[in-house]
A protein has these predicted regions:
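Conserved beta/loop motifs at nucleotide-recognition and modification sites
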Residues: 1-256
């Protein structure tokens, strides 16, 4: 248990350092991005691109490489491509598992990571592929530890999400109180990509400045966990009609 807490604290410290470095324009050469919160990951990738590459120069200096079929040769050629009318290049590799690469490719990749040019920023994004370091592969793990940062974009704490939901609604000209923001999280889950689309729908639907629970219930699509809780609660209160209605909603959600 203590080890898990220490790992979580270390990951949070790296995340805070990454945000501070980014705000100060101090962007390194190598990053591993992983974690469930894709909204934040994509947000910070956009921030990195904006800070590293002048507007209009993205097509020359921003390189997006799919992990499937990627070779060390292809990556090396992209890394060696000099920036054009930009101080740096940004390379984003999606879903390439460094630690599961064939030995020859892994050795070549390790060499690339160990000697990245100063103008290059290389980001490995683990989206559908889970990130798991393997200390037995000492050279690769050592290169990542020495040259890069492993940044985890974890699910946000409820207090941070409530504040963020409030800011998003204010940007749409609405207000929402803490209890209703918490209800929205309960109903729609705590991942920001899911919440942002529901916030947009609710903001467009709400007639008054203050968003109400009725506004949320009218248009928000609940996650299955919330409906299961609602059904068991209705069963506990012996409200069978409501329980069966909720069961019907669950079947519909599963079909969708």
């Amino acid at each position: 248990m203590a080890t898990k807490r220490n790992d979580k604290s270390a990951a949070q410290a790296v995340y805070r350092k990454f945000k501070k470095d980014l705000s100060q324009g101090t962007i390194g050469s190598l990053y591993i991005f992983h974690g469930e919160e894709a909204y934040l990951r994509d947000y910070y990738l956009d921030q990195m691109k904006a800070k590293l590459i002048p507007g209009g120069m993205e097509s020359f200096n921003y390189h997006l490489l799919p992990g499937k079929g990627l070779t060390a040769q292809r990556l090396g050629e992209t890394v060696d491509a000099l920036p054009m009318m930009s101080p740096r290049t940004l390379i984003v590799v999606n879903d390439y598992d460094l630690f599961k690469a064939p030995e020859g490719e892994r050795t070549a990749m390790t060499k690339i990571l160990s000697d990245l040019p100063e103008y290059c920023c290389l980001v490995f994004v683990y989206d559908t592929v889970p990130y798991k370091s393997d200390a037995r592969m000492r050279k690769l793990a050592g290169a990542i530890q020495e040259k890069g940062q492993v940044v985890q974009f974890a699910r946000q704490q409820q207090g941070d999400l409530v504040d963020w939901i409030g800011r998003r609604f204010r940007a749409l000209g609405h207000e929402i109180d803490t209890a209703d923001a918490q209800y929205l999280i309960f109903l729609c889950g705590d991942l920001m990509n899911g919440l942002i689309s529901e916030i947009g729908k609710i903001g467009a639907f709400a007639k008054n400045r203050r968003v109400t629970r009725q506004d949320i219930d009218a248009v928000a699509i609940p996650v299955i966990d919330a409906k299961v809780f609602e059904m068991t609660d209705a069963l506990g209160r012996r409200q069978m009609d409501q329980a069966f209605a909720t069961l019907g909603d669950l079947f519909q959600l599963r079909q969708e």
